[in-house]
Structure formats: structure tokens, C-alpha cells
From Swiss-Prot:
UniProt feature, compositional bias: Polar residues: 529-539
UniProt xrefs under InterPro entries: Cyclophilin-like_dom_sf (IPR029000), Cyclophilin-type_PPIase_CS (IPR020892), Cyclophilin-type_PPIase_dom (IPR002130), Cyclophilin_A-like (IPR044666), PPIL2_U-box_dom (IPR026951), Ubox_domain (IPR003613), Znf_RING/FYVE/PHD (IPR013083)
Pfam families: Pro_isomerase (PF00160)
Organism from which the protein derives: Mycosarcoma maydis
GO BP, one annotated term: protein folding
Signal peptide: none
Entry's localization field: Nucleus
Protein name per the record: Peptidyl-prolyl cis-trans isomerase-like 2
Length: 582
């Protein structure tokens, strides 16, 4: 069978005395078995502490990774000696490794998206520190002679490629052959003198301090980039009634993308885009087209009473109302007045180039919404902008119908008095400066009063609803306890629910009992109702006779009902009835 083979169910004499004994003839086999028995250090573990690292670094001549918080104290304690090779290693030559994660939180190649394993051939680029599979660098860099980083596009040479893990040479990662293990160079917690990676040796000076400062500045963005995709998928939304109400009609598109791209994990469930609270509020207000808000602008020429179309332009109206409540329009000027066209204001700077929304950014237009209002008459309130989706705080009021502005500006309100508004007429009569259209006489908004706000009413209802359903609220707990006691009082120890004392329920119960008694007058048993009734033959009677019979039948029925009610109230269990209770 051959020496050293293991395909027999017994040990030969040579094997017993050699490989598994102490025979010198099998020393080569014994050495191979001893060498294969070690466990190489994984690429995601520190070669000093043999624990997973959080800030991986390495040297240019050796790609074995170290934890930064372990490497710096080690080099300071043992005079810049490389922990693995024993050569000199200065902090100026430290290379920060950047490893990217996939949706499952596992490290992968940022180009081919293949996951790293314990037997993957990994290399890093010295300039950027990005870690790739050797196959990716060989196919996309070395063979086409494209010597630029595939992620950052930084130029590099072949000597800048650092081998992080080579499965064909695991002996390079043998922990027993490392310099600090063979020489017992141990690092204690007292040597570290740190609490976290953000407090690494705050007293370091020179190149050490310079390196740490650079790493602190780059650590957070790099970690954010590396886990951008994983953090998105890791955030799981618990499906509740509230979250279902916040789900929009469009999906995230990840289901289709996962079946199109092989780099994404297949998904079979469609995930809806979750709207924020404001978008949910806008959808609710939009579902009620008659929702209106009312604002009173007090100017030095008089008051302007405005009606806002919240059901047609909810986002624009909400922005306008919030600016009014926060006093952003108080003491502002109408900086542009064109008689026969419009008057414009809403800029706190009074120059026509300022103003911002409540979100401190421009927001979308709403003139394409179904049923949107048009610039068709005098006294229309509309948003001023600098182009598509550039609404902020400036608005204008028209002096006449201007249909050429339809589809360019969002109409979100009107003057209550319309073309008969006396204040607007006075403002139109103020002359303007040639070239700038600035009024020669100051037209100022002195005060703003919001008299009705459907958004505030909606938010108040939401707060009340949330409080009513809050398990931690004392009122909710008292209500649930009262309901529980009432339910326990109505249920016997056999699980039977007792009849309620509600008047309607009592009336229904009495009517049911009367019907049962009436049925028992012509049938026996609850299953003989259809066959127990006496069959009568239809006879064509004289009209007078028919009227007499009907009168007699009514009297008989009235007497029967009275007797049945009396019997039911007196003693329902006095007779056998129709045996339906048996």
C-alpha cells in the first residue's frame, strides 16, 4: 500500500514505529504533519493580540495586519521592531488598510464584489490602502498594464502591491514563527495606556503624533464608505400600522435590482419607500382638497386677507404658514412692484436675492398637481422662484390674470376680497423706480396673523392619537384596566359571556324570546318550524268578508303578542316552549 498511507483500517509496523512512533525514516512525513498542524493568522485579526482588529494597518514589506492601538505601543516599547519579521519598522511607513463590506457585513472585493475568505489571495495598494483580490488586480491592472487604483484612480507601480494573504504560503502567517512570539515580546494593558482608538497616546509627538492626527481625520469617512451598503440593508423597519401608513406607493427597487445584478443578495419581498412625517401629513391634507388656511397680512397700506389652498399645494402652504408663525415676514418690504402685473415680497433682506424656506433649502414645485390653480385673475398668491424647484420664501400677488406664468410658478392662495380689495389697489398705485421696479414709497409688512391652520390641527390630532395609544400613558393604562375588569365581569369561570345590561341588548333579547314563544304555538321542536305550520288553502273571498277576516286576524295577533310578552316577562321557564333550550 505504500509507506505513510492511511487508507487501511490498521497501522503497519513501519507506521507504528515511524510516523506515529520515533523512527528516523519517517522524519520527513512527521515534519510535514507538524508543519500542517499550525493555524495561520487570519487576515482580519491582529498579529500582535490575535484578536479582530478595528483599525487595520500593516507595513509595506509585510502585509500581515495589526491593530493600530496595539502596534504603536509595541513599537514604542520595543524600539521600532517589526512584530513579525524582527526588522526595523518606523511609524512613518505605516499603511492604513481599507476593506469594504457588502450587504451582509462581510468583507469583499470592491470591484468584483466577491467575498473574502480564509483561503483568498488578498493584496493591497500602498498608496490608497484598498484591499483587492489578487485575481482582480492581475486581470484589470497587470495584464492590461493599467497601473491605477481601481477605486481611487491613484497611480502605483508593481512594487507597491502588498500581499495581505497568500493561501499558497500559509507559513508566512504561522504565529509560532513570528518575532514577538519567539522572543516573548508581550504587550500589557499598562503599556497601551489608552481607553479607545480615539485616545491613542495623546502625548505622542513627532511622526507618531502626525500619523495619529491623519488617521483620526480619515478613519470616520473611510469607515462610513466601507459600510455604506451594509448599513442600508441592516436597517430593518418593523412593520406596524403606523409604518404601513407612512409607506408610499413606490418601492425601493431593490427587488428588481437584486434579480438584475449578481452582486446583490436576491430579495423576494417588495419594500416600500418610507415617507417622513411631513410627507405623510402632506398626503393627508392633499386627500382633502377643501382644506384651507387663512392669513392676515397687516401692511402700512392696510390689511391683506389671504386664503391658502392647502389641499392643492400642501408643501408650499406649510412653508408659508411656518414662515409666518416664526415671524420671518415681519417688517419685510415688498421690493418689486409692477402696476398691471404683480407685487413681490417675502425677502428678509429686501433685495430680491435672499430668503430661505423652513428647511433651509429650496423645495419642489406643485403646479403639476391635479386640480392646481392657475394665474387666471387678480389677487392670486403665487411663489416666486429662480427656475424649476427653487422655491424658498419669496411670493407675489397678481394685479391681473397672467396665464403665461402657469406651469412656472406654484399658485397656493388668493386674496379673499379678490379684485375688490382696496389695499391691493392702493399698493398698485405706488410708482416704481425705472429699471429696478422698486417702489418709490415703502410698502412694508408690519405683522402677520395666522387665523386657521389645518396642518396644526392635523399635528394636534396625531399627538392626541399617539397619546391615547401610548402604553406608558396613565390614562391609557386606566382605560385598559377598566376594559379588562368589564370583560372579566361579563365572563364566568366556564368561559361563558353573561348578557349585557345595555337597553338595546335587552330589547333584542326580549324580542328573540317572544319569537321563540310564537314559534312554539304552532310547532314542536326547533327543527319542525317549516313542517309544523298548518297549511291553508287560498280561497278567493268576497271583499267585505276579506276585510272582516283581516280585522279579526289583527286583533288575534295583537292578543297573541300581548299574551306572549306577559308570559315572557312573568316567567319564561314556566312551560316547555319549543324545546329549543333542551
Amino acid at each position: 500500500m505504500g509507506h505513510g498511507k492511511s487508507d487501511r483500517p490498521f497501522l503497519s509496523a513501519a507506521e507504528h514505529s515511524g510516523v506515529y512512533g520515533a523512527h528516523s525514516a519517517s522524519s520527513g512525513k512527521a515534519g510535514a504533519l507538524e508543519q500542517a498542524s499550525f493555524h495561520p493568522v487570519s487576515y482580519d485579526c491582529c498579529a500582535i493580540s490575535f484578536q479582530p482588529w478595528s483599525v487595520p494597518v500593516c507595513s509595506p514589506d509585510c502585509g500581515i495586519a495589526f491593530e493600530l492601538t496595539n502596534l504603536i505601543p509595541f513599537l514604542r516599547k520595543f524600539s521600532s521592531v517589526h512584530p513579525v519579521t524582527g526588522k526595523r519598522f518606523d511609524l512613518d511607513n505605516v499603511v492604513r488598510l481599507n476593506l469594504h463590506k457588502n450587504q451582509h457585513g462581510r468583507f469583499h472585493d470592491p470591484v468584483s464584489f466577491k467575498e473574502f475568505g480564509q483561503h483568498s489571495h488578498l493584496v493591497a495598494i500602498r498608496q490608497s490602502g484598498n484591499v483587492f483580490l489578487w485575481d482582480t488586480v492581475q486581470r484589470l491592472n497587470l495584464k492590461p498594464k493599467y497601473m491605477k487604483d481601481l477605486v481611487t484612480d491613484q497611480a502605483f507601480t508593481k512594487s507597491d502591491i502588498i500581499t495581505v494573504q497568500d493561501p499558497e504560503h500559509p507559513e508566512h502567517r504561522n504565529p509560532s514563527e513570528m518575532h514577538h512570539v519567539k522572543n516573548a515580546l508581550k504587550l500589557t494593558q499598562a503599556d497601551k495606556g489608552i481607553d479607545s482608538s480615539q485616545q491613542i497616546n495623546m502625548g505622542a509627538i513627532g511622526s507618531t503624533h502626525k500619523l495619529l492626527s491623519t488617521l483620526r481625520e480619515t478613519t470616520q469617512p473611510d469607515m462610513h464608505t466601507a459600510s455604506a451598503s451594509s448599513s442600508t440593508s441592516a436597517s430593518k423597519h418593523t412593520t406596524t400600522a403606523y409604518s404601513r401608513n407612512k409607506a408610499s406607493g413606490s418601492s425601493t427597487g431593490m427587488t428588481a435590482a437584486s434579480f438584475t445584478s449578481s452582486s446583490l443578495t436576491p430579495r423576494t419581498a417588495i419594500e416600500r419607500v418610507i415617507l417622513d412625517d411631513e410627507e405623510v401629513m402632506f398626503s393627508h391634507i392633499k386627500s382633502r382638497p377643501s382644506s384651507k388656511a387663512y392669513v392676515r397680512l397687516s401692511t402700512n397700506f392696510g390689511a391683506l386677507n389671504l386664503e391658502l389652498h392647502c389641499g392643492k399645494a400642501p408643501k408650499t402652504c406649510f412653508n408659508f404658514l411656518q414662515l409666518c408663525k416664526h415671524g420671518k415676514y415681519d417688517d419685510t418690504l415688498f421690493h418689486r412692484n409692477i402696476p398691471g402685473f404683480m407685487i413681490q415680497g417675502g425677502d428678509p433682506t429686501g433685495t430680491g436675492r435672499g430668503g430661505s424656506s423652513i428647511w433651509n433649502s429650496n423645495f419642489r414645485d406643485e403646479f403639476n398637481e391635479p386640480g392646481a390653480f392657475k394665474h387666471d385673475t387678480r389677487g392670486v398668491l403665487s411663489m416666486a422662484n429662480k427656475g424649476k424647484d427653487t422655491n424658498a420664501s419669496q411670493f407675489f400677488i397678481t394685479y391681473r390674470g397672467v396665464p403665461h406664468l402657469d406651469g412656472k410658478h406654484t399658485v397656493f392662495g388668493r386674496l379673499v376680497d379678490g379684485d375688490k380689495d382696496a389695499t391691493l389697489t392702493k399698493m398698485e398705485q405706488v410708482p416704481s423706480e425705472q429699471g429696478t421696479d422698486r417702489p418709490l414709497k415703502k410698502i412694508q409688512i408690519q405683522d402677520v396673523l395666522v387665523t386657521e391652520d389645518p396642518f396644526e390641527q392635523y399635528q394636534l390630532r396625531q399627538k392626541q392619537s399617539a397619546k391615547a395609544n401610548d402604553p406608558t400613558d396613565p390614562e391609557y393604562q386606566r382605560r385598559m384596566e377598566k376594559r379588562k375588569r368589564r370583560q372579566n365581569d361579563r365572563t364566568t369561570w366556564l368561559g361563558t359571556e353573561l348578557p349585557t345590561n345595555h337597553p338595546e341588548a335587552q330589547q333584542k333579547q326580549s324580542e328573540t324570546k317572544i319569537d321563540n314563544l310564537l314559534v312554539g304555538s304552532w310547532s314542536v321542536g326547533k327543527y319542525l318550524n317549516s313542517t309544523g305550520r298548518p297549511r291553508t288553502k287560498t280561497i278567493q273571498a268576497h271583499p267585505a268578508r276579506k276585510e272582516h277576516d283581516e280585522s279579526a286576524a289583527k286583533k288575534t295577533k295583537t292578543n297573541t303578542n300581548a299574551i306572549a310578552i306577559a308570559n315572557a316577562n312573568a316567567n319564561a321557564n314556566a312551560g316547555f316552549g319549543d324545546f329549543s333550550a333542551w
